[in-house]
Amino acid sequence: MSKLRNSLCELCTALIFFCGCSNEPLQPIRSGEIWPDNNGEHINAHGGGVMYHDGTYYWFGENKCDTTSSAMVGVMCYSSRNLTDWKNEGVALSVVDNDSSDIARGCILERPKVIYNAKTGKFVDVGFHLELKGKGYAAARAGVASRVITPAGSLPFHPFGTCQCW
């Protein structure tokens, strides 16, 4: 029993040491400072969530601008292998320049969450809070979008619950 305990302690010590080793030092995250992506731009992914898939973390969140809380861009996607260095993967769900669309530029699109559905092999935005353009918080809708193949890329939006994601 003592040999087993010693071996486990040695293994844990080695794992802690080697897991902390890296070719490149990680940049510290400083509270209260702007956190830059791989392009030196501040990460713009508010109210979002992080998912892990095939060795990579993906951060999805609302792109916010300085002048309004309305969605002027959409949902952003960032990827990271270490939770410190983030690559901008682009707009995952874009608002559109069509006032008859539920996701028209100027709508309120908040708190997007994405998961991987192993059964279908698709990445699914399991939901986001959606308010129609110019209606404030009166509509109280939820939105769903899905994508195939990779978590980074454009999500097709499915209004009125027509998504065949499951």
Q: What are these model-derived regions, one by one?
A:
Residues 9-19:
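Bacterial N-terminal signal peptides
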Residues 1-11:
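Bacterial N-terminal signal peptides that target proteins for export
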